[in-house]
Amino acid sequence: MESLRGYTHSDIGYRSLAVGEDIEEVNDEKLTVTSLMARGGEDEENTRSKPEYGTEAENNVGTEGSVPSDDQDREGGGGHEPEQQQEEPPLTKPEQQQEEPPLLELKQEQEEPPQTTVEGPQPAEGPQTAEGPQPPERKRRRRTAFTQFQLQELENFFDESQYPDVVARERLAARLNLTEDRVQVWFQNRRAKWKRNQRVLMLRNTATADLAHPLDMFLGGAYYAAPALDPALCVHLVPQLPRPPVLPVPPMPPRPPMVPMPPRPPIAPMPPMAPVPPGSRMAPVPPGPRMAPVPPWPPMAPVPPWPPMAPVPTGPPMAPVPPGPPMARVPPGPPMARVPPGPPMAPLPPGPPMAPLPPGPPMAPLPPGPPMAPLPPRSHVPHTGLAPVHITWAPVINSYYACPFF
């Protein structure tokens, strides 16, 4: 509540004449300006201490004390100009000075919470975090980008062997221009992907078997055969139109009996071979005379050298052939005479008319066949048909599906 200290009766009269409203409007405008100034200069206001605000308040109180004396002097001087005194602007100074301390206090109260937040413990800044222990940076591992040819070769090798040894991996790496570690990591990832796909296939086929109608299960050795029927394969069949009865084929006439083959005459047995009588022993061949040694040939006489060939004498130079006379131009012959057209061809005379063929004997009618027995009526065919039942085979090793369902 505002105190009336330092105000005179004329000030109270001014308030009754709506002067106070103008002052309040001015104070409101001043409040808006100071609030904007306070927002703009937070750092400056925060640095100021409370004793400075106290000294400002005391100075303002001192000015308030000096204002009533001026008003009293003005009242003592005379009240012959009341309208001029109402319009004098200095009268608003006491009001403004009186209103300023509460505004400063209000501004101080508004600015104190940010000041406490600024003066309070702050989070660690850049230099402090730099001094503290920092976690080591994780280096991002570079992924190998395989080409289409490398992937195709790796997939083909994986189809043959899922666990290649060191020698096979080194050969494959040298052929594909890769390192052995990269090939080993690729096979590990490929085996994990293969196992994951097997689990997905197992769950998918298990769900399909659960949805099927209750059927028997055939167990045979290490393979479990489970019939699986997919309800989505049930289709609605169009009712078939009745077909005309099919006439039966007449039975074939019996064939004449085959003439039996005459029996072959028996083969006479071969006479036994007469035993060879033991003859006298072969006389040994006497050795012939020894061959006389061939005498050596006499040495060949050396062939005498041929006499040197006499050089062929060069003939006289050939005289140049003189050019002959130019060929005479063949004169053009007379134009060819046009062949006159020949006489027209005489038409061929018509031949004698063809004699009609005599009619042949009439064809004998075919004898009627035996009557056909009527076919039994067909059973009713339902309009809704089911797809054929599929048999899924899966090898089971130690209660684990080792291969996908086929």
UniProtKB/Swiss-Prot annotation:
Residues 244-378 are annotated as: 15 X 9 AA tandem repeats of P-P-x-x-P-x-P-P-x. The keyword Transcription regulation applies. Coiled coil: none annotated. Its main location: cytoplasm. CDD domains: homeodomain. It is found in: Cytoplasm; Nucleus. Disulfide bonds: none annotated. It comes from the Eukaryota. Residues 74-83 have a biased composition (Basic and acidic residues). One of its GO terms (biological process) is negative regulation of DNA-templated transcription. Keywords: Cytoplasm, DNA-binding, Homeobox, Nucleus, Repeat, Repressor, Transcription, Transcription regulation. A motif (Nuclear localization signal) lies at residues 138-143. Residues 87-105, 113-123 have a biased composition (Low complexity). Undergoes proteolytic cleavage; produces a 45 kDa N-terminal homeodomain-containing fragment (ESXR1-N) and a 20 kDa C-terminal fragment (ESXR1-C). The keyword DNA-binding applies. May coordinately regulate cell cycle progression and transcription during spermatogenesis. Inhibits degradation of polyubiquitinated cyclin A and cyclin B1 and thereby arrests the cell cycle at early M phase. ESXR1-N acts as a transcriptional repressor. Binds to the sequence 5'-TAATGTTATTA-3' which is present within the first intron of the KRAS gene and inhibits its expression. ESXR1-C has the ability to inhibit cyclin turnover. This is Homeobox protein ESX1.
